[in-house]
Structures are given as structure tokens and as C-alpha cells.
Amino acid sequence: MTGSAPNPDADAVAWGDLLAGSYREIGERAMRDLPIYNDALGVEAVGFRAFNGTIVGIMVTPWFMNVVLPASAVAQATSGATARIRFPAGDIEFTISEVGQIGRIASCSLFSPMFQFADMDAARATAEAALAELMLPADSEEAVRRREPATTPIDRRNFLRGTLTERRG
């Protein structure tokens, strides 16, 4: 038998692409002429994947970068405009909103506006890194190592001379 194995994230990627299409339309219709619009960027769904029975990924637009998931992932009993969702890295607060043809989504803002990004490569790399951090368990060896302070203090004289030679953690 030939062919490839089914991609478990195919539905997630498709949903992310559909959401990106809605944001492209919003960008052209309502955002392009606003001062928060970064012309160097486009709209892209980054890293969309299956997660705990739902979909999660990062939406990059010329005016924001958000972690997003379908609002159906939020318990129906939840009322109000926000919800806390558990990720391996910890609980994250999301805002519930409506997006065009997609309907209700839950989003968590990472950046807005987006002027600190010179191009899509920089924005995409940041989105990928943010999603990786979100999926890293807070008590994992890697997460603990990243939180540890430097093993030696910085020598002030060398710092002021611009000759730091100490090994940092």
C-alpha cells in the first residue's frame, strides 16, 4: 500500500487557514489605512495543531499576533468575555470574540501593534517560539533551566569596559 499516513493536525491547519482568510479580508476592508498596520507583514496562521481535543495556533497579522483557538473549546458554562485555558506552560486568559465567517474564537494577545517586526520571517519565528514555550510544561527540565538565574554575577568593571568574559548559565 502506498500513500502517506493521515496528518492528525490537518483539520487544525485547515481551520487556521480559514481564520487567516477572514483576517486577510478584515485587513483589506478595515485595517490597512489605520496607523497600527505594519505594511511589511502579511496574515499567516502559524503552528496550528490539535491540542486537548481542540485546535490551537498563532495568528500573525500586520496589526497583532494572538494565540487563538475555537471558542467551542471553552466550556459552555463559561459566561463573560474571558476564559482561562490550561496549557502545559500554565493557565492562560483568553478573550472571546466573533470573527467573520468563522464565528466565535478565543484569543490571547501576544503583540499589538506589530512594528517591532521588520518582516514576516521575524514575526513567524517569534510566533513559533511563543507556541513552543506555551507547549513546554512549566515543571520540565528545560523550563526550569530557562528560569534559573546566571550562575555567576556580572563583574561591573568588565561590563563597563565591554569585556564580559564570565560564563553565563
Swiss-Prot record:
Pfam families listed in its UniProt record: NiFe-hyd_HybE (PF11939)
Alphabetical list of NCBIfam families matching this protein: hydrog_HybE (TIGR03993)
Family of the protein in this entry: Belongs to the HupJ family.
Protein name: Hydrogenase expression/formation protein HupJ
Source organism phylogeny: Bacteria, Pseudomonadati, Pseudomonadota, Alphaproteobacteria, Hyphomicrobiales
